[in-house]
Amino acid sequence: MTYVLDLKRSFLDACTWLIGDNFRDLGSVLWVPLPILSLVIVATLGVLVIVWLERKISAGVQQRVGPEYGGALGLLQPLADGLKLVFKEDVVPAKSDTWLFTLGPAVVVIPIFLAYLVVPFGQQLIIADLRIGIFFWIAISSIAPIGLLMSGYGSNNKYSFLGGLRAAAQSISYELPLAICVLSVCLLADSLSTVDIVESQSSWGILTWNIWRQPIGFVAFLIAALAECERLPFDLPEAEEELVAGYQTEYTGMKFGLFYVGSYVNLLVSGCFVTVLYLGGWHGPFAIDGILPDSPPFQVLDAFLGITWTLLKTFLFLFAAILTRWTLPRVRIDQLLDLGWKFLLPVSLGNLLLTASLKLLF
């Protein structure tokens, strides 16, 4: 399509129509926090959906019913969980480092929300189309383990401290293969922009998605993403049988709730980047660019379809991640590190070399 839906221009035009030309600058000021606020609300609602899916899928795997009393099909159960955490007492251990103990959850959650700045839900449906958007995500996601280490050390608890150390070791081990797999995709797209990466997969629909051009990188990225999210079988930093609850052991109330939200938001953003890098982003399986007329109603339809396809692909990844959690056993810490350093890192480097060689030849 030649013209795409520009939300900012549409918002400013609506402000001009409602309150006059003299207040167009006011509309520009109001626009600044609006996308960020909308994204935070949508991400939080996404967490509620994931929590409900986790409960229902785990119940299906274990042949149970799952939540059914909290509203229709148990849809209000995640909301009840959140309200319960809000009203719990916020306990700070007596001999803990209060500053580190308090700042830790915020340092974990804030970078995860910032990653949504570069997630495209459509050609213009992105908050910040940075030229280095994909590496902005990798850089910003590397901050979260620092918060986990702060939380573990500040708790003055041996189990919490060990959980924080495990989180740091796990992040370092799997950040490298993750970044190298991303670099292979960027070589194919000739860009580090998330929008350009999606556009490079739009020529022939599903046939040009990077999952077919980068099958090795896709599998390596999938494993590394699950490890970065600390999902089973890679949840060593909070292994109940070994570390009680890891770095979360001393936390209660909303501070514990921040870890809870951060874990699921991180899983959601990882699903978004799997979609962007390997599954064609907002594009459907069939190439329809240029088919729809260039009129405002069809621009809105195109934007709606883009958001729908992005969310469908993202929740497909989430379904696989949840199913993996309830079907595979936890690995040992030595197996976790061996998988990262002795398997994924050489495989991702070989995939990068192969991609660069084919790029030079063809």
Curated annotation (Swiss-Prot):
Keyword entries, A-Z: Chloroplast, Membrane, NAD, NADP, Plastid, Plastoquinone, Quinone, Thylakoid, Translocase, Transmembrane, Transmembrane helix
A GO CC annotation given for this chain: chloroplast thylakoid membrane
Membrane-spanning ranges: 31-51, 99-119, 132-152, 178-198, 206-226, 268-288, 303-323, 336-356
GO molecular function: NADH dehydrogenase activity; oxidoreductase activity, acting on NAD(P)H, quinone or similar compound as acceptor; quinone binding
Membrane topology annotation: Multi-pass membrane protein
Signal peptide region: none
Record's keyword annotation contains Thylakoid: yes
Top EC category: translocase
E.C. number: 7.1.1.-
GO BP: aerobic respiration; photosynthesis, light reaction
Localization in the cell: Plastid, Chloroplast thylakoid membrane
Known catalytic reactions: a plastoquinone + NADH + (n+1) H(+)(in) = a plastoquinol + NAD(+) + n H(+)(out); a plastoquinone + NADPH + (n+1) H(+)(in) = a plastoquinol + NADP(+) + n H(+)(out)
NCBIfam families: PRK06076.1-2, PRK06076.1-5
HAMAP family: NDH1_NuoH
Family recorded in the similarity comment: Belongs to the complex I subunit 1 family.
Subunit structure: NDH is composed of at least 16 different subunits, 5 of which are encoded in the nucleus.
Biological role stated in the UniProt entry: NDH shuttles electrons from NAD(P)H:plastoquinone, via FMN and iron-sulfur (Fe-S) centers, to quinones in the photosynthetic chain and possibly in a chloroplast respiratory chain. The immediate electron acceptor for the enzyme in this species is believed to be plastoquinone. Couples the redox reaction to proton translocation, and thus conserves the redox energy in a proton gradient.
Protein name: NAD(P)H-quinone oxidoreductase subunit 1, chloroplastic
Organism: Nephroselmis olivacea (Green alga)
Gene: ndhA
